[in-house]
Amino acid sequence: MTAQALFDFSGAEVLVVGASRAGIGAAIARAFQDAGAGVVITGAEPEPAPEDRGRFPYVQLDVTDQDAVRGLAARTPRLDILVNCAAITARGEEMEPSFFEHVVNVNLHGTFRTALAFYPHLKASRGQLINIASMYATFGSPRNPAYGASKAAVQQLTRSLAIAWAGDGIRVNAVAPGFIVTQQSARSRSDPAHVAAVNLRTPMGRWGQPGDIAGPVLFLASNAAGFMTGTCLAIDGGYSIA
């Protein structure tokens, strides 16, 4: 198989859950579309980011609503690749139990709900599931304990589903982004000292862009990664090894 064929997604049907903002999910969706796939995106917002309106079919979806998730699965005739990207933080409030539970419900339970709902589709297509974890699965965070705990659990869920579903021909992998320039990180990036500290520790000397995550996700979903399952790729410019 040629290198070009390894990354040709022509005819593949992709669902990116959590792509209503111009961030990681949207970048992943655009990359799959550019590689020939048919792509549907979801998000909590009524509409996608302005630059994506009209580019993708869009479904407003609350991943904490099991009936809504199952309903979307029932309306989806075929799926080859599912990307779970929906996530939130409650910065500075996650020590409050209600906020903690809500973050975990979206980030962890939402990932699990969506994976289970689309399991029959992925089994039928011998497809791929890609979960978006985080560097905070490894590092503690005094302000975001729920986010870190939920993303660590997403990594473990990825390993468990990889084992459980391998016999069905489904590969399950994850990526763990580092500091990325998105709307979600805007508050952190408003502090010049914090930006400088991240750049100083990161061997590659910069924050990542959403497109930096899209390429590795396409790799994991491609035939080039056909013997990989249960893995989580750190995409953080070397931050986690510095």
Please state what every model-predicted region is.
Residues 2-4, 23, 139, 200-204, ...:
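Short C-terminal tail/terminal secondary-structure segment
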Residues 6-39:
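Canonical Rossmann dinucleotide-binding motif of NAD(H)/NADP(H)-dependent dehydrogenases/reductases
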Residues 91-104, 198:
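Substrate-binding pocket helix/loop in short-chain dehydrogenase/reductase
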Residues 115, 150, 158:
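Active-site helix of classical SDR
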Residues 134:
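Residue(s) in the substrate-gating loop at a strand-loop-helix junction
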Residues 166, 171, 228-230:
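Short, small/polar-rich loop/turn modules that mediate ligand/substrate recognition or access, typified
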Residues 174, 193-224, 228, 237:
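C-terminal helical subdomain
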